[in-house]
Each structure stands twice: as C-alpha cells, then as structure tokens.
C-alpha cells in the first residue's frame, strides 16, 4: 500500500468498511504464504483466528467488525469469504507423502555397508530405522533446511529446560540391562549390545505439545530386523568416535544424528536435504522411477515418509487406531489420511475370507 501511495494511485475503495475488509483479506493471503509468527505455513482455521484477532483489535477502537459487510450479518463479507473458501479448498487437495517402506530400508542397509561407518549414509540408515520404530518427526532427530553446524542446532526457546535442543541428544537415552544395571547417554556403549534389555528415549520437544514424554523400546532379537535399540547404539558409538575428532560435540546439547564429511573434513548434523536426497534415490531404485521424468512423484518422499510408512505398516498388520496413536505419539486420528491400500492388506483379506469359507456359514 505504501508503494501505491508513492505512485499516487487513487484508492479504488474510499469506503472505510470496504477498505478495512480488503486489508483483512490481504492479511489472510499474506499469512497463507508462510508469513506467520513462526515463519511457516499455517492452516486455514488458524488464519481465521489471526484475522479474528486483528479485527477484534480494530473493533476495540472503531466498534465495528470489518470482516462483515453489515454488522448484522452472520457470514463473512463478500471479499473475505472467498479468500477463506479458497484456502480451505486448497487444503483439501490431497498432497500426501509417500511411505518409506521395508523394501527401501533393505536397500539402504545394503548400501550402508559400502561406506565408512561414520559417513552420511550409515548415519542416515540408523536415523531412518529409529524414525521407523519411534515415528520421528523431522525436528526430533534432524535439522530443517541446510543447518549442519553441530554447534548451532535448532533450539526450542519455549521450554524451560536445561536441554533446549529440539532433536534428541545422547543424554536423552537411558537403558536397563539384563542384570538390572542402569546407564544413560554415552555410558550406554560401555555395555555390550546383547545385554541391553530396555531403552527409553525422552522427547523434550514434540509437535503435539507433550514435551518430556518418554517411550520404551526393547531390543529385537532378530539381528537383521528393525531395532530401535540397535540403531541408537550404533549412533551413540558414532557420536563417541566423532567426538574425538571434534571435542565441541556435547552429549547434552548436540543432536545424536551426526556424521563425518570427508570433503571439508568436519563433523556435520543430518539435515532435511540429506534425508530427501537419499530417500528419493532409494525410492527411484526400488520403484524404477527416473530422476527427471518422475521428479514430481519423487518429491513426495521426505523425512515425514518415515512416520507415514510406520503408520501404513502397523495398520496393515492389524494394529488398532488406538495402538497406532500410542506407538507413534499421535493425539488424534489424523494418521488416517496416510493409510494406503497395500499388498499386505489385500493378502490379509484373502486369508480372512479363506478362513471364513472353511467355517459353517449357517
């Protein structure tokens, strides 16, 4: 609007109420582009709350709700209503992430054996395995954007705790051995992996607001299967080795997911770009997708695919909605939008029909 004033454009809406509604509509569009207080995109319902707050502030001086054409109207004005409608319509378009699946993980584990144990690929594979078991959100184990400096991880300044690192750090883990000995942090690797009976991880910062929640995991006796305990143990060993190279790594402040980058010869944090690059290459190899011709489809694999994949597998294996909510730390049934018609479900259906056909029907 300052630009308009500088060019001496005339106001097309000299009417105060109409001008105010235009401003509120532009504010809603501004918010929809990610210009919120947290500099990220927000839902249409949240945008309505932002606009409501702005309109309430204005009404405290003017005594008029400028969101409506007339004070007696029950609905939004003719300018603001279409903006709200389009925002909700845009949200309803399905743009779901594709699931990270066991086939992709099997390929990832084979590839990891070709790289040094402290390099990016083995670190990613361990992070993927943890995420698949615990339903990690991106910020719970990695960094958004290209943030890779181990001394500058993402922090949560909204919690009053000594540890404010958003991603889990070595000190967030504790174990109980088969001989009932307890240990935490980097001291865990002083034990042999085979004697660890239970492991707890503390999520100090969660999207659902349940800060400080702890989850229990046990060690999978199958050495080739998914195992949260084993993958964390390898990550702790990697952290300990890299700490020798970079003493700045802190068990209480530095995220667990670190790796050695040989080109600049330094320790780095795993970032979302690393995750997306590797996961999309895995998807391309498993599903025979070309990087250029299928680039739009490959964009649907990201860090969130770990949570989606875990949800799909648990549902296909017969876990109840309550079980999935509890295991993957959902506070609602929002995970339902991620479910897929996978081969496991089709096979389970046939088995159920065959068992039913073998029983007396009447």
Name each model feature, range by range:
Residues 1-362:
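Extended, non-catalytic subsegments within catalytic or DNA/protein-binding/adaptor domains
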């Amino acid at each position: 609007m300052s630009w308009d004033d500088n060019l001496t454009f005339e106001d097309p809406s000299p009417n105060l109420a109409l001008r105010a509604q235009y401003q509120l509509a532009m504010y809603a569009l501004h918010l929809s582009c990610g210009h919120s207080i947290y500099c990220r995109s927000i839902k249409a319902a949240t945008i309505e709350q932002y606009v409501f707050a702005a309109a309430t502030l204005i009404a405290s001086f003017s005594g008029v709700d400028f969101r409506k054409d007339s004070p007696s109207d029950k609905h939004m004005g003719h300018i603001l209503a279409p903006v709200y409608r389009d925002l909700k319509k845009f949200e309803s378009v399905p743009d779901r992430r594709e699931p990270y699946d066991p086939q992709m993980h099997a390929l990832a584990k084979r590839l990891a054996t070709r790289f040094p144990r402290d390099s990016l690929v083995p670190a990613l594979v361990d992070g993927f395995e943890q995420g698949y078991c615990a339903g990690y959100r991106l910020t719970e184990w990695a960094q958004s954007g290209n943030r890779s400096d181990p001394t500058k991880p993402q922090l949560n300044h909204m919690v009053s705790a000594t540890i404010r690192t958003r991603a889990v750090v070595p000190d967030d883990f504790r174990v109980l051995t088969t001989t009932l000995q307890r240990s935490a942090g980097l001291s865990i690797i002083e034990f042999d992996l085979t004697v660890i009976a239970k492991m707890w991880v503390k999520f100090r910062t969660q999207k659902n607001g349940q800060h400080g929640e702890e989850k229990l995991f046990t060690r999978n006796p199958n050495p080739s299967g998914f195992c949260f305990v084993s993958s964390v143990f390898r990550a702790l060993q990697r952290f300990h080795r890299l700490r020798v190279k970079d003493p700045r790594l802190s068990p209480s402040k530095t995220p667990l997911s670190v790796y050695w980058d040989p080109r600049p010869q330094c320790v780095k944090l795993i970032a979302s770009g690393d995750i997306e690059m590797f996961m999309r290459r895995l998807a391309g190899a498993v599903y025979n997708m070309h990087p250029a011709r299928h680039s739009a489809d490959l964009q649907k694999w990201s860090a969130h695919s770990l949570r989606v994949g875990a949800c799909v597998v648990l549902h296909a294996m017969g876990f109840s909605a309550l079980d999935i909510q509890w295991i993957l730390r959902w506070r609602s049934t929002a995970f339902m939008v991620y479910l897929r018609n996978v081969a496991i479900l089709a096979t389970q259906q046939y088995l159920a029909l065959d068992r039913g056909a073998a029983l007396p029907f009447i």
